[in-house]
From Swiss-Prot:
Pfam families: Acyl_transf_1
Organism: Salmonella typhimurium (strain LT2 / SGSC1412 / ATCC 700720)
Listed NCBIfam families: fabD
Name of the gene: fabD
Superkingdom per UniProt: Bacteria
Gene3D superfamilies referenced in this protein's UniProt entry, alphabetically: Malonyl-CoA ACP transacylase, ACP-binding, Malonyl-Coenzyme A Acyl Carrier Protein, domain 2
Organism placement in taxonomy: Bacteria, Pseudomonadati, Pseudomonadota, Gammaproteobacteria, Enterobacterales
Assigned keywords, A-Z: Acyltransferase, Fatty acid biosynthesis, Fatty acid metabolism, Lipid biosynthesis, Lipid metabolism, Transferase
Active-site feature positions: S92, H201
EC number(s) reported in the record: 2.3.1.39
GO cellular component: cytosol
Pathway the protein contributes to: Lipid metabolism; fatty acid biosynthesis
One GO molecular-function entry: [acyl-carrier-protein] S-malonyltransferase activity
Family statement: Belongs to the FabD family.
Name of the protein in question: Malonyl CoA-acyl carrier protein transacylase
Length: 309
């Protein structure tokens, strides 16, 4: 079997009805959601299957839902005798999914932790004052320059380096709008405002990170059974304090996804499996390293194909 890695998606990959087909085939999916529901005090499976979407899309509910979906798929993989990946990585919230699957954080602890992470993020910025935009077709340096020149005393910066030519910026809503216009003037094909209420991974998230650090200190961290590439430094940490520190800094620093995928490829990995709903990371992979292949493990046929590789 070729060397493979598991990657875990972040916010934006959720949808009402996600994993329904997997749950119909593998009871462990609903069992995993039942565990999460017990930790949270509400029926998370009902929310993911019935919605409404505006509830599922609230960040403090999105985050536990995506984490649980990824852990459920990982458990299906293990139950079916799937081999261990060479590496793991997750995009933003997905880093928590990776750490659970690598045995670093207990699942119930992680579910409660990411719910709090979502609440802290929402509390850090008053509703309607933050924004995010995807900048398509402009180099990283030009985007950084546009952000610097558009700040005017407010916060705006690149926050997700998703693939070459696809970078997300975040900060104060007006500054994001100015920077988007500056990026277009500098040659960007598009500046797409994203329908989010929280400007993730920018300096406005520092108060949320400080609160998160307090909660992270209460949780036991174990050594990873599989190396996890972190978002903030593109490193595989084994020490609990270093993993905690990277999670705190992740909240107000950019997600280095392009570099993470390049790092994974440099370790001899040839295929990425996306473990979670949607196919966002699968779509980004080829744009980052064209020799890498990728596929999503969220449907029974795709899972069966992967298990027979």
């Amino acid at each position: 079997m070729t060397q493979f890695a598991f990657v875990f998606p972040g916010q934006g990959s959720q949808s009402v009805g996600m994993l329904a087909e997997m749950a119909a085939n593998y009871p462990i999916v609903e069992e995993t959601f039942a565990e999460a529901s017990a930790a949270l005090g509400y029926d998370l499976w009902a929310l993911t299957q019935q919605g409404p979407a505006e509830e599922l899309n609230k960040t403090w509910q999105t985050q536990p839902a995506l984490l649980t979906a990824s852990v459920a798929l990982w458990r299906v993989w293990q139950q079916q005798g799937g081999k261990m990946p060479a590496l793991m990585a997750g995009h933003s919230l997905g880093e928590y999914s990776a750490l659970v699957c690598a045995g670093v954080i207990n699942f119930a602890d992680a579910v409660r932790l990411v719910e709090m992470r979502g609440k802290f993020m929402q509390e850090a910025v008053p509703e309607g004052t933050g924004g995010m935009s995807a900048i398509i077709g402009l180099d990283d340096a030009s985007i950084a320059k546009a952000c610097e020149e558009s700040a005017e005393g407010q916060v705006v910066s690149p926050v997700n380096f998703n693939s070459p030519g696809q970078v997300v910026i975040a900060g104060h809503k007006e500054a994001v709008e100015r920077a988007g216009a500056a990026c277009k003037a500098a040659g960007a094909k598009r500046a797409l405002p994203l329908p989010v209420s929280v400007p993730s991974h920018c300096a406005l998230m520092k108060p949320a990170a400080d609160k998160l650090a307090v909660e992270l200190a209460k949780i036991t961290f174990s050594a990873p059974t599989v190396p996890v590439v972190n978002n903030v430094d593109v490193k595989c940490e084994t020490d609990a304090a270093a993993i905690r520190d990277a999670l705190v800094r992740q909240l107000y620093n950019p997600v280095q996804w392009t570099k993470s995928v390049e790092f994974i490829a440099a370790q001899g990995v040839e295929h990425l499996y996306e473990v979670g709903p949607g196919k966002v990371l699968t779509g980004l992979t080829k744009r980052i390293v064209d020799t890498l292949t990728a596929s999503a493990l969220n449907e029974p046929a795709a899972l069966s194909a992967a298990l027979t590789q």
